[in-house]
């Protein structure tokens, strides 16, 4: 009898524990909910905005900042492993990889995102076209800005525009023509999809004016005497 009672108690204890440890984490969102609504998609895009200030170590204006490694910049004694050079490269490509993944997920979940964009609790702007394409325009602008920054430092760099695995295949450096064709295509898409203006909590997000301003900067750089001497006279004319 005691053995039967013990077996019953043990089975009850095991049954009562079932599902107890299968709870969703309270400090992070499960991946399956990342793009199930417009607001969920917007939160992912917001990550890019939040990280935009970290790709170049921010602005260090206090005299308390001391970076002995930067002393190599004066005599131009920098190498590919110097901290400032390595960080600039790796941080921008980490940012680009994040943008590539977000773009892929936005495209995959476009239908469900567009369906409930009108019920957003985070974005009260009037969106006349596809809400997903608007978000993609913002992301493509931010990714293009990262590539433009890399080009200004290094010239042509590998153009990686799709998510890659842990060990991506070797990608050769893009030519100047390839770089600017990519940048202009990205700006054209963003100019078409982004909104005219933003206000309230959305103030600071990419607008058509921001895209036009950045596009002008890219074209001036493209036509500069240092980078494209044959176009310099045309720019002045």
Residues of each region from the PLM?
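Bacterial Sec-dependent N-terminal signal peptides
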Residues: 1-26
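Proline-centered turn/helix-capping motifs that create local helix->coil transitions or kinks
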Residues: 19, 56-59, 150-159
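Acidic, serine/threonine/proline-rich low-complexity intrinsically disordered regions
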Residues: 157, 161-164, 170-173, 213, ...
């Amino acid at each position: 009898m005691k053995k039967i009672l013990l077996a019953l108690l043990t089975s009850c204890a095991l049954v009562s524990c079932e599902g107890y440890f299968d709870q969703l984490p309270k400090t992070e969102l499960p991946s399956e909910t990342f793009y199930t609504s417009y607001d969920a998609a917007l939160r992912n895009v917001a990550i890019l905005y939040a990280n935009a200030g970290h790709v170049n170590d921010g602005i260090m204006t206090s005299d308390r900042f001391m970076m002995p490694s930067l002393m190599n910049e004066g005599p131009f004694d920098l190498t590919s492993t110097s901290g400032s050079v390595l960080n600039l490269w790796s941080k921008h490509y980490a940012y680009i990889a994040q943008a590539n993944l977000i773009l892929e997920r936005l495209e995959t979940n476009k239908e469900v995102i567009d369906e409930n964009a009108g019920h957003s609790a985070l974005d009260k702007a009037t969106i006349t076209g596809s809400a997903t394409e608007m978000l993609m325009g913002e992301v493509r602008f931010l990714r293009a800005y990262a590539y433009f920054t890399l080009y200004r430092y290094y010239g042509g760099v590998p153009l990686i525009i799709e998510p890659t695995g842990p060990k991506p295949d070797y990608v050769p450096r893009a030519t100047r023509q390839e770089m600017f064709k990519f940048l202009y295509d990205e700006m054209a898409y963003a100019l078409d999809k982004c909104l005219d203006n933003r206000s309230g909590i959305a103030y600071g997000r990419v607008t058509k004016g921001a895209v036009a301003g950045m596009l002008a900067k890219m074209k001036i750089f493209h036509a500069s005497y240092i980078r494209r001497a044959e176009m310099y006279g045309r720019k002045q004319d």
